[in-house]
Amino acid sequence: MDTKNKRFILTESEIPTTWYNIVADMKNKPRPILHPGTKQPMKAEDLYPIFAKAVSDQEMNQTDAFIEIPEAVREEYKKYRCTPLVRAYGLEKALDTPAHIYFKNESVSPVGSHKLNSALAQAYYCKQEG
């Protein structure tokens, strides 16, 4: 009988305190987003009319690997981040890889946590800016 843990659920104290920005760690950075009017690389300021300043700054950030999650957002995450992390032992075996592969089981959240994770943060920053 297989006794390995397959499902992992974070406690409230284990909820991340930072977002990970993969671009900061990429050796080859993605091509810049081009301004639709000028066709020149966009700056964070170009996004301010559309998004909250903090969201725009984070979107264009290529240097900080970790971005602090505001306490108020983390408190809201505690209500909604209950989706389990599942270890894909079968896939690891099929791929014959020593890597540990995990996936989030979003079937327990009707809207999918990625939507709430993003929406809560965007609403927080918009509220901060008035």
What role is predicted for each listed range?
Residues 1-130:
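PLP-dependent amino-acid enzyme catalytic core
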